[in-house]
Amino acid sequence: MRIAICASEGAPYCKSGGLGDVMEALPAALARIPGNEVVLILPYYNKIKHNEAFPVEKVAEMQVQLSWRQQYAGVLKLANRNDGVTVYFIDNDYYFGSRTGAIYGNLDDGERFAFFSKACLDALATVNFIPDVMQCNDWQTAPIPTYLKAMYHGTFPHTRCMYTIHNIEYQGWANANFFDDVLGLPWEYRSVLDMNNSVNVMKGAIETADLVTTVSETYARELMYPYYAHGLDGIL
């Protein structure tokens, strides 16, 4: 089985919290299963770029269309991983390479990770890795299931998408203009992402993914209750 995992962080390359730990363990565990081919895609942050422990080679260059804007993306392959996991980084100085400090907390985080989500799909097509399963994580890669269904079905006709919620408190809220100005999705998907007259990319992922999972059975049960689901219990 071909598996592509897309995340905004993954140890040891970049880590902010528990998601980074999961993205260190999960790809390696899946790669140990005979017959699996596993790819992990991460942003090429400044802290990775300047770390000599993570040598890379450029394998492709692309122009990623994000609504009206077109942004360069380099596809870099980690050169020294030997556990069966292929690691690709999405390189873009504007969104990732030139930013110092914390991974999150930029005013344009919504745009940054919408770009990353779309670039993941373009990168997989460019390196000709057509996965059987795509696994996406939290709000940062929540646009992927919707993009996959709305704009990439011809490229990935048999790919199924699994969306995993690690922390439902952060849902990727944006104003209504974000749908047209940044995401650039077809009009018929507006209602899929609409919540209280705003855009909620996690809601969109829940509605368009083939399977929605959480980090544990306990958390999955908790999310059935309004107190824990932060407004998404009706969708779940």
Set out the residue ranges of the language-model regions.
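Catalytic cores of nucleotide-sugar-dependent glycosyltransferases that transfer UDP/GDP/TDP-activated
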Residues: 1-236
